[in-house]
Amino acid sequence: MSRKKRYINNGKTIKEMLNLVVKKFPGEPAFKRKEQGKIRKISFFELLTEVRNLGTALYEDGLGKERVAIIGENSYPWFQVFLSIVCGGGVAVPLDKGFTATELRSCLERSGAKAIFCDKKHEPLVQEALALKEEGKEALDIKVYKMTGEEERLSEMKKIGEQAILNGSTAFYDAQMEADDMAVILFTSGTTSMSKAVMLSHRNIMSNITDMQHYERFYVSDVNMAFLPLHHSFGLVGVLVFMASAACSVFCDGLKYISKNLAEYGVTVFVGVPLLVENMYKKIWQKIRKDGMEGKVNFGLSLTKIPGFRSVWMRRKVFSKIIEGMGGHLRLIICGAAPLLKETAKGLNDFGIETIQGYGLTETSPVIAAECPEDLAAGSVGRPMPSMQVVIEDKDENGIGEIVAKGPNVMLGYLNQPEETAAVIQD
């Protein structure tokens, strides 16, 4: 398939988005994952089938339109669960795997979750949180489902859902939702003593995805490495935007396996935070110096200033060995959450790996502004997304002030905190 093939998804809800992709690209890989040492491709059709089976099982368990929490490492089972919740009309509550038992219990109580899915590693934390007893509070009546490890429930649940569908159940298939219905509750890591529960609708998320699809260049042939935590809006929407674009996502095996995973999965897009991206760039130069190639690389960099050598294609040709060291296919790095060093952004772009920055927050689902490959400026976060209006209020003599943003990606509000919501949403 041509590298340049793009797909703009017009879905108004996450369920509609997934159905549209499956209808047009049923056989394209939605995910790749390792199974028994081999890489397996999961097509969009297979993904939807598994999501429908699991979502139907949730209806069979009385959880079809409830709030359901998820905690665990980034994984394909994690995302299956997420999609089965939100595409069935429920609300997903992704939770930070770094929570203490007390923090986890608090978020479960505040969110109103009726069940929680956890992986094997975090089951002890979940059980500890549920066992906590606080004076004057009732015990939490929450169902616990294991996603991975011994006694994992997903395989059994998918069989239950499949049989229910064969028996005539259409509960999940028929589940209706409006664009303004809540889809996700995300807890901010926050600067206050208690994190806020941000309510995001299908419209919030899908409008941001559509903006990014029009503004950036995502291709059907792309392979996105999902490294950022899925309980963060940047990590979660970072996978959803590639799914909406009919591209593939993979999950990193861990920090020390990034280089290996980039190569074996054929990763073309990496979404990360500055510290990680800067470390990747430092390692490139460490290897250049170790191999005694500094002079040749500097000569190559001088060539890229000549008009005939400025194209991305030519830069990648000149620095093909560096590209090979980054897995051989990496073409785009998207960075957010904090400022990226100008030297790093410029350096990676000079090597032919387009590196862009964005700015946003959980409350805006999350992107407010971003660079695009046609409009790069090291040190900048680019321009506002197409559907956003952004102004700087109360500017000082240096032009620094408060960023005020308006658009369809602005949250529904903070859960059960009307005063806090009113303080930040004025229109």
Features from the language model and the residues they span:
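Structural core segment of the AMP-binding/adenylate-forming
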Residues: M17-N19, C87-I160, F172
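Conserved AMP-binding A3 loop
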Residues: K41-F45, A183-I209
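Conserved pre-ATP/AMP-binding loop-to-beta segment of ANL
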Residues: P26-P29, A164-F187, M194, R217-V223
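Conserved AMP-binding/adenylate-forming
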Residues: F270, M314-D427
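Short beta-strand->loop structural element characteristic of the AMP-binding/adenylate-forming
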Residues: A69-I71, W78, F82, V86-F117, ...
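Flexible, low-complexity linker/hinge segments
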Residues: K4-K12, R153-M182
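Conserved AMP-binding/adenylate-forming core of the ANL superfamily
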Residues: A30-G62, E66-S75, F79-L83, T100-E109, ...
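Conserved AMP-binding/adenylation subdomain of ANL enzymes
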Residues: M206-V223, L230-F319, H329
